[in-house]
Amino acid sequence: MENEILHSERLLLRRWEESDAEELFKIASDPDVGPRAGWETHRSVEESREVIRRIFSNDATWAIVCKETKLIVGCIGYFTHATSNIPIGESDCEVGYWVAKPFWNQGICTEALRLLLHHCLCVKHFQEIWADHFIGNPASARVLEKCGFRDTGLLNRCSHLLGGDKDMVRVMRLETHGKTF
């Protein structure tokens, strides 16, 4: 697994480590966080450790770390054609992210997503980048719009996500013409 670290003025995106389990549990046990992103709140440090092992330990997922405090504040990554929630092309990816509640409305998701988009376009050379968000999460829609995503008009059900069998997700696509990240 590559150990790429991406960084901006305030943030560091780095690979997850099993030693992050306690920090992950602190932010992923908040009932206001997981369901907005389609997963259940974590119930134990061991569950968080297992999520790091089974889900986050790959070349496409990063911990979002605040440079100033060195605290993990969220998670960001991309999914390829084989693992995407939505039907995308083989040379496309879908991005996803979440941030702990104390860090909402601070521009952290937008800053982290811009880092990831640069990586996806300039390093991984994906052709198109897609995203989706629950209709009931307008803050996520605003993050995507700030980064250049536009509504495709498509709605989707993601029954494997918590709430995805009853709540629709809006599918958005990145408009890359003339954009730099």
Model regions and ranges:
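Acyl-donor (CoA/ACP) binding surface of acyl/acetyltransferases
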Residues: 1-32, 65-181
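Conserved GNAT-fold acetyl-CoA-binding loop/helix
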Residues: 32-53
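A short, aromatic/hydrophobic, helix- or strand-capping loop or linear motif
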Residues: 37-41, 61-66
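A short hydrophobic/aromatic micro-motif that marks alpha-helical segments and, especially, helix-coil
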Residues: 44-45, 59, 163, 179
